[in-house]
Regions:
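Conserved AdoMet/S-adenosylmethionine-binding subsite of the radical SAM
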Residues: 1-124, 128
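Radical SAM enzyme core and accessory elements
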Residues: 127, 139-155
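Conserved beta-strand termini and adjacent loop/short-helix elements that scaffold enzyme active sites
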Residues: 98, 135-137
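Residue-level detector of anion-binding/catalytic polar loops
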Residues: 131
């Protein structure tokens, strides 16, 4: 992942980069995304900082809102701190809040955050001057929506 970010920065600086974050906490992110054990968030953030510094392009942080898991005020405040700690270029970080889309193949341990929780999360980011948007839910009826954490296995 980090070598890919560096390669993208070097070879395709005009391309906007989106990074799947889903938790500002290392331990929880490792539980949600095992790749975090190989590429810890703090090291990935260093690579993303270098990308932003070199390209001066907005970087998108995708954040799937999982009810009762990563949608608390504590998570929002930690995410704001993570972005603000980027320093002078923190204004180039943008958060896309993505409502979790449940399908017949997604993990049953996850549920979607409710709209009020998503709004409160967004408001905390806004109050910290973090650029944030909440994505609309499209495509979940056909298994094509953002916010679906699963792999379709075929025989």
């Amino acid at each position: 992942m980090i070598p890919g970010i560096k390669r993208l920065t070097r070879d395709f600086p005009q391309v906007n980069l989106a990074f799947s974050l889903h938790s500002p906490f290392e331990k929880q992110r490792s539980e949600l995304m095992p790749i975090n054990q190989t590429y810890p968030l703090h090291k990935v953030m260093d690579a993303l900082d270098a990308h932003v510094a070199n390209t001066k392009r907005r970087l998108f942080l995708a954040y799937i809102m999982l009810g009762g898991i990563n949608d608390s005020a504590e998570h929002a405040k930690a995410l704001a701190h993570l972005i603000l700690s980027r320093g002078a270029l923190s204004y180039l970080y943008h958060v896309d809040l993505i409502p979790y889309n449940v399908t017949d193949k997604t993990a049953r341990k996850f549920i979607a955050s409710n709209n009020e929780t998503i709004k409160n999360f967004s408001d905390i980011l806004h109050s910290n001057r973090i650029s944030v948007a909440t994505r609309m839910q499209f495509g979940s009826d056909i298994g094509a929506g953002c916010g679906q954490l699963y792999a379709d296995e075929r025989d």
